[in-house]
């Protein structure tokens, strides 16, 4: 009798390597699936390791461009910062990983999907809600959450089954990375009073070590999409990765955040997102130049809600679909180039230009070339202030008394 097939989201680390053997012992035929979303994984090594540990098949997928174009771009155009700080690094990759897991499951005829998330984090929610949205018929298994082992028990299990134990197990931090940034938690970071050590950072340098000379970059957008950096056309993934290096060496994008998790607990997170911060800053500036006032004032409401739905694992929900539709409808005229100075942790916009600019220098100037009709202001003020004036006239006739 053929074994039930299960597709495992495989990272190559201890948790998911142990999960392969545990699932095999539980009677499954395990198919491993690993994505590269810009963290620089050695896919060949991971593919081979999955087979060595016990998987019958191992898929490795280079998903950098898809992640950039279909997920990171939405976060960029939404200026997405959960709670005003977190640019949704891990939250963005989970729906793409879930999508690929479902695709592999369909291709292999699998009846279940497994992930390596714990029962305390947000990722278990993101994976399972996404999988159920895409494939309601598939069963979801969570070995790490189910077995409730300690780290020591996992290591002992790995040694008993000749599973290679990663050499970095003494690393005190829990790290997740993709091209949109790097997240870090655990270890000394669990004390919110502790200053993050430099060992917690990888994409950025400290302000003390940042160069004393800034870098000036020019980012060109077409319909809200970054298409070139300093005049060189690039794919979106390559542009983000290149900007991570340039902005990172100036210490741009360090974020230290106390975060309200979906599961109800607070966590202390340290993020590095040099490209994300720089691109969002530039994109927002271009919108300011090209948006009419009403759209500029309303869009932040949509941005906040998109940030929440993505963080909460609702990427494939009807609400997110509707919010993204509005978002995309605003980007048609977001065309132009933004000049940004990167210096000592800051991304500072110093210039902007657009063929769709709504800024009219002749209207804005106070020089003799002014074309603004100041006489029109009298009638505008009268009508604009009319409700306030009427209210004041009516209420000034009313005597308010207070009896004790």
UniProtKB/Swiss-Prot annotation:
EC category: ligase
Positions bound to ATP: 9-17, 116
Catalytic activity: L-citrulline + L-aspartate + ATP = 2-(N(omega)-L-arginino)succinate + AMP + diphosphate + H(+)
Domain of life: Bacteria
The protein's annotated pathway: Amino-acid biosynthesis; L-arginine biosynthesis; L-arginine from L-ornithine and carbamoyl phosphate: step 2/3
A GO CC term attached to the entry: cytoplasm
Binding site for L-citrulline: 86, 122, 126, 174, 183, 259, 271
Pfam family, one: Arginosuc_synth
Similarity comment: Belongs to the argininosuccinate synthase family. Type 1 subfamily.
Protein name: Argininosuccinate synthase
Organism of provenance: Listeria monocytogenes serotype 4a (strain HCC23)
């Amino acid at each position: 009798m053929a074994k039930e097939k299960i597709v495992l989201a495989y990272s190559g680390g201890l948790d998911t390597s142990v999960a392969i053997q545990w699932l095999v012992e539980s009677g499954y035929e395990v198919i491993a699936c690993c994505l590269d979303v810009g963290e620089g994984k050695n896919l060949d090594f991971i593919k081979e390791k999955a087979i060595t540990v016990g998987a019958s098949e191992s898929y490795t997928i280079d998903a950098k461009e898809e992640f950039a174009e279909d997920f990171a771009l939405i976060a960029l155009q939404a200026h997405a910062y959960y709670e005003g700080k977190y640019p949704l690094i891990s939250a963005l990759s989970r729906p793409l990983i879930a999508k690929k897991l479902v695709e592999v499951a369909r291709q292999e005829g699998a009846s279940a999907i497994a992930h390596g998330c714990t029962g305390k984090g947000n990722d278990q929610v993101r994976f399972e809600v996404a999988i159920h949205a895409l494939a309601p018929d598939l069963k979801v298994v969570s070995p790490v959450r189910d077995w409730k082992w300690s780290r020591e028990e996992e290591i002992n299990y790995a040694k008993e089954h000749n599973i290679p134990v990663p050499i970095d197990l003494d690393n005190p931090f829990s790290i997740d990375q993709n091209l949109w940034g790097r997240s870090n938690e655990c270890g000394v970071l669990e004390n919110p009073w502790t200053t993050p050590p430099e060992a917690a950072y990888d994409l950025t340098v400290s302000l003390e070590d940042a160069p004393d000379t800034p870098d000036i970059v020019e980012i060109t957008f077409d319909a809200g999409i970054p298409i070139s950096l300093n005049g060189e056309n690039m794919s979106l993934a390559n542009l983000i990765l290149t900007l991570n290096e340039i902005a990172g060496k100036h210490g741009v994008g360090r974020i230290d955040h106390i975060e309200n998790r979906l599961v109800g607990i607070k966590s202390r997170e340290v993020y590095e997102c040099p490209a994300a911060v720089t691109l969002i800053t530039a994109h927002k500036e271009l919108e300011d130049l090209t948006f009419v006032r009403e759209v500029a004032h309303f869009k932040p409401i949509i941005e906040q809600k998109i940030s929440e739905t993505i963080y909460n694992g609702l990427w494939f929900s009807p609400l997110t679909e509707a919010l993204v539709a509005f978002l995309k409808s605003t980007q048609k005229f977001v065309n132009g180039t933004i000049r940004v100075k990167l210096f000592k942790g800051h991304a500072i916009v110093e210039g902007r230009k657009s063929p769709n600019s709504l800024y009219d220098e002749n209207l804005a100037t106070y020089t003799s070339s002014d074309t603004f009709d100041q006489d029109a202001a009298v009638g505008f003020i009268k009508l604009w202030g009319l409700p306030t004036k009427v209210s004041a006239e009516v209420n000034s006739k009313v005597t308010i008394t207070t009896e004790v």
